[in-house]
């Protein structure tokens, strides 16, 4: 958002005069804006409230917002509060592209084909967002994966300056005594994480 060259390149590719020069809201700012009534509607996709920095405030925000759309695979705290729940395909059921924080692109194809499924495959997140945009008379111009990938290819890889790689000092690891062990896990994936549903 702060690099004029990047904004100019994307604006030219998209055929618009200019792009905003300010940053958009981060998750905490979105939650706060919804909780205080500054945002009238939210589209929430695949978010587990317990994984957010302030789950209590997130619950307040979802209850306060005027209209809530949820894109989800399974019931959640978000779907319980949503005005509309739209099912979306799981990663294994769709093709797509991941772009990591460094801007590296990784395309993937569907692991499961429609003829391998016992139910009708739900639409992709991108297709659902396109349908919502169409209903709001907003032209995204990304009706399918092929068009979206062509758009990413047209933009090309960023060759300008990048943020410095973060440097963190590793914390000292606990040393177990004889006969002891240290169990370490990632809070977002274990404990009460959604990946444990049904287990």
Features from the language model and the residues they span:
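A short, flexible N-terminal coil/short beta segment enriched in small residues
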Residues: 1
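A cross-kingdom feature strongest in bacterial/archaeal respiratory oxidoreductases
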Residues: 4-119, 128-137, 143, 147-199
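ATP-hydrolysis module of ASCE/P-loop NTPase motor domains
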Residues: 123
